[in-house]
Amino acid sequence: MIKVSLKDGSVKEFEAGLSVYEIAKSISEGLARNACCGVVNGKVCDLRNKINEDVSLSICTFDSQEGKDAVRHSISHVLAYAVKRLFPQTKLAIGPSIATGFYYDFDKDVAFSAQDLEKLEAEMKKIIKENPSIEKFELPRDEALELMKDEPYKVELINDLGEDEIISFYKIGEFTDLCAGPHVMSLKPIKALKLTRSAGAYWKGDEKNKMLTRIYGTAFLKKSELDEYLEAIEEAKKRDHNKLGRELKLFTTDENVGQGLPLLMPKGAKIVQTLQRWVEDEEERRGYVLTKTPLMAKSDLYKISGHWDHYKDGMFVLGDEEKDEEVFALRPMTCPFQYTIYNAEQHSYRDLPIRYGETSTLFRNESSGEMHGLIRVRQFTLADGHLIVTPEQLEEEFKGVLELIQYLMKTLGIDEDISYRFSKWDPNNTEKYINDPEAWNKTQDTMRTILDHLKINYVEADDEAAFYGPKLDLQCRNVHGKEDTLFTVQIDFALAERFDMSYIDKNGEKKRPYIIHRSSIGCYERTLAMLIEKYAGAFPTWLSPVQVKVLPISDKYNDYAESVVKSLRNKGVRIEADYRAEKIGYKIREARLERTPYILVVGEKEAANNEVSVRSRKNDDEGAIKLDAFTERLLNEIATKER
């Protein structure tokens, strides 16, 4: 008999060799009917999996995230099945579930057309209606390679697997695919699916590899859920920062400038400047000192820091090591520069903590397939910072960093959109990370203890750390469901040693400090993208590039309009006036489309009484208000950063 610890805390005994499904059925027939997959010892698995030892087990139903992922993963295989039926010469790559659905990558001579997607969707529905059996089986490596001999991408994936790894397959009807699972027991419960679009994607995300065709889609148990999703997709398209940011003249791009190099237009630049001044002032209030460091450095500096060994492919290198006496590189991070500043003078324990802050322009050689609008770029501006602390100060300073980030998030109104990820190293990937298992384990244990003390609700993720230490990443999803890191806090165990950083403790002994890397508001470009999508371009007044627009009803009142502009501009308000000889209704509509928080209409009555007729985004037409009263209200709204 084996012991199975269930999610409710109970422990039950079962015969060894039962499947997860059989265990679910023994607990409840209803649970078995609704079961989609399981989680055994923290790892998602198939209901078909056999249990042969003591384990912890959670049964995941269709409405759980794990269940939704299993449904969509299964339907990605149905898509591949349909492709093989209709386009049998197509070669298969990979087909995972993603946050809002699934995709599958194909190698096909001619890209799929919109009509092809319609045919494939119809064929998928036909396959589901056939209700084919779904089987899982495993094969030794040689038999697996033989089975997949006509699928070059599958052969490559099999060869990438370690010698001891299990090679498993799923067979849906007459279609077999290499896959670790999990998959649903039957396609019958899946009542709604949609293929949403196709796009290009490099094999394994590497632009040196062949460009494949990626088909995206989604699936649900109910048509009503699909309808809701499709409505959300339409709303997401309206909010997409790539579309809206251009419409609102916040940024643009140009192929002559280059991919991943967005140009912030005056309005976008004003938002970033407002954020930057706010962050720098807030950091100064919290004891940060400002640095200003070069945009590039000799390769020698990056060799000390480890970037040359672990991050060189992500850097823009100026020169040739074999030909040039000196080789430079644009900086991907600020840390080695601020450490050099620290080493410019001796430090006592009384000097610590030192909190360095800098608004840094950084450069990273992102692959063309990774770049997206303002979210993934090759040049960006980071609210960077490094705290040099004693071991005793580490937890309190880490807490202080989090409090700063949480204050900024709450003010921006994005605190409820954030999730926390504890990013750890992969001990098998020594090319990516500094290879010091003892230091990694100690530092990760330290960070985990701090996070638990602070009661942070986080998930753990392997192979997501920085090369020099673990991270707490604050993750935010864009309108399309893709998750990106917005802010990060890292504990560095390596670079103090590499840069020979030290302080003199109270006993007069030389000690190594701890280092906390952090970004208080992240990359300004990425944060701007998230804010565009969060507010659909209708930013809070304090953040809006134009806070007030004055509209005279005719040119007779231009002088009064100009006096209103001067009065408010002298008080720091970002204000414009529209003096065009257009109908007032047209000018109001235009100002609304620009998401202007306040529109002030002025005519004879307003000029005579020193008033403005206010139209606000929140309350629409508010009527005439004394200019002084409106000014007081507006300045208070800006000062308090009201949303």
Curated annotation (Swiss-Prot):
<dbReference type="GO" id="GO:0016740">
    <property type="term" value="F:transferase activity"/>
</dbReference>
<dbReference type="InterPro" id="IPR012947">
    <property type="entry name" value="tRNA_SAD"/>
</dbReference>
<comment type="similarity">
    <text>Belongs to the class-II aminoacyl-tRNA synthetase family.</text>
</comment>
<dbReference type="Pfam" id="PF02824">
    <property type="entry name" value="TGS"/>
</dbReference>
<feature type="binding site">
    <location>
        <position position="386"/>
    </location>
    <ligand>
        <name>Zn(2+)</name>
    </ligand>
</feature>
<keyword id="KW-0030">Aminoacyl-tRNA synthetase</keyword>
<dbReference type="GO" id="GO:0000049">
    <property type="term" value="F:tRNA binding"/>
</dbReference>
<dbReference type="GO" id="GO:0046872">
    <property type="term" value="F:metal ion binding"/>
</dbReference>
<dbReference type="InterPro" id="IPR004095">
    <property type="entry name" value="TGS"/>
</dbReference>
<dbReference type="InterPro" id="IPR004154">
    <property type="entry name" value="Anticodon-bd"/>
</dbReference>
<keyword id="KW-0479">Metal-binding</keyword>
<keyword id="KW-0862">Zinc</keyword>
<keyword id="KW-0067">ATP-binding</keyword>
<dbReference type="InterPro" id="IPR012675">
    <property type="entry name" value="Beta-grasp_dom_sf"/>
</dbReference>
<dbReference type="InterPro" id="IPR002320">
    <property type="entry name" value="Thr-tRNA-ligase_IIa"/>
</dbReference>
<dbReference type="InterPro" id="IPR012676">
    <property type="entry name" value="TGS-like"/>
</dbReference>
<dbReference type="GO" id="GO:0006435">
    <property type="term" value="P:threonyl-tRNA aminoacylation"/>
</dbReference>
<keyword id="KW-0436">Ligase</keyword>
<dbReference type="InterPro" id="IPR036621">
    <property type="entry name" value="Anticodon-bd_dom_sf"/>
</dbReference>
<protein>
    <recommendedName>
        <fullName>Threonine--tRNA ligase</fullName>
        <ecNumber>6.1.1.3</ecNumber>
    </recommendedName>
</protein>
<dbReference type="GO" id="GO:0005737">
    <property type="term" value="C:cytoplasm"/>
</dbReference>
<keyword id="KW-0820">tRNA-binding</keyword>
<dbReference type="InterPro" id="IPR006195">
    <property type="entry name" value="aa-tRNA-synth_II"/>
</dbReference>
<dbReference type="InterPro" id="IPR033728">
    <property type="entry name" value="ThrRS_core"/>
</dbReference>
<dbReference type="Pfam" id="PF07973">
    <property type="entry name" value="tRNA_SAD"/>
</dbReference>
<dbReference type="GO" id="GO:0140096">
    <property type="term" value="F:catalytic activity, acting on a protein"/>
</dbReference>
<comment type="function">
    <text>Catalyzes the attachment of threonine to tRNA(Thr) in a two-step reaction: L-threonine is first activated by ATP to form Thr-AMP and then transferred to the acceptor end of tRNA(Thr). Also edits incorrectly charged L-seryl-tRNA(Thr).</text>
</comment>
<comment type="subunit">
    <text>Homodimer.</text>
</comment>
<dbReference type="InterPro" id="IPR018163">
    <property type="entry name" value="Thr/Ala-tRNA-synth_IIc_edit"/>
</dbReference>
<feature type="binding site">
    <location>
        <position position="517"/>
    </location>
    <ligand>
        <name>Zn(2+)</name>
    </ligand>
</feature>
<keyword id="KW-0648">Protein biosynthesis</keyword>
<dbReference type="Pfam" id="PF00587">
    <property type="entry name" value="tRNA-synt_2b"/>
</dbReference>
<dbReference type="InterPro" id="IPR047246">
    <property type="entry name" value="ThrRS_anticodon"/>
</dbReference>
<keyword id="KW-0547">Nucleotide-binding</keyword>
<feature type="binding site">
    <location>
        <position position="335"/>
    </location>
    <ligand>
        <name>Zn(2+)</name>
    </ligand>
</feature>
<dbReference type="InterPro" id="IPR045864">
    <property type="entry name" value="aa-tRNA-synth_II/BPL/LPL"/>
</dbReference>
<dbReference type="GO" id="GO:0005524">
    <property type="term" value="F:ATP binding"/>
</dbReference>
<dbReference type="InterPro" id="IPR002314">
    <property type="entry name" value="aa-tRNA-synt_IIb"/>
</dbReference>
<keyword id="KW-0694">RNA-binding</keyword>
<dbReference type="GO" id="GO:0004829">
    <property type="term" value="F:threonine-tRNA ligase activity"/>
</dbReference>
<keyword id="KW-0963">Cytoplasm</keyword>
<feature type="region of interest" description="Catalytic">
    <location>
        <begin position="240"/>
        <end position="540"/>
    </location>
</feature>
